[in-house]
């Protein structure tokens, strides 16, 4: 089973003087959020890592329904890239649990906030290879 350092609000979580870690579904949730919230091209070693979601939505004057469809497509692409990364981990004989691997992308929804149209609420649902549903959600500002 693999693990990652636990993050909260972008900071490492330390409890009792020890760095906390995440595994299984909690790790997959964190991996999904990191992949979707990292702007593609910002990691010089892995320029393909991340999504173009923020570049699409922030400051764009296209119709909201067009932005939503483009955003869904970009999130789907970045989640497929995450699946490929997970497959590479398994092929390299790294121990990766079934609950930290995406089996299928169940749903991606992007909803423009009715009160503040500069905000988009994003929800992602995936099925793990351990047959568990993982739901990730975050808010993106178009400003």
Residue positions per predicted region:
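Immediate N-terminus of the mature polypeptide
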Residues: 1-69, 100-143
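Mid-chain, well-packed structural core segment of small domains
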Residues: 66-103
């Amino acid at each position: 089973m693999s693990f990652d350092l636990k993050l909260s609000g972008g900071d490492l979580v330390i409890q009792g003087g020890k760095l906390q870690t995440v595994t299984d579904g909690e790790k997959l949730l964190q991996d999904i959020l990191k992949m979707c919230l990292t702007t593609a091209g910002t990691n010089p070693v892995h320029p393909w890592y991340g999504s173009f979601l923020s570049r699409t939505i922030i400051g764009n004057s296209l119709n909201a329904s067009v932005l939503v469809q483009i955003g869904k497509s970009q999130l789907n692409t970045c989640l497929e890239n995450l699946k490929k990364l997970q497959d590479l981990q398994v092929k390299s004989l790294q121990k990766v649990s079934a609950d930290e691997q995406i089996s299928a992308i169940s749903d991606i929804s992007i909803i423009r906030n009715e009160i503040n149209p500069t905000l988009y609420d994003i929800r992602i649902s995936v099925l793990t290879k351990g047959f568990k549903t993982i739901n990730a959600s975050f808010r993106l500002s178009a400003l």
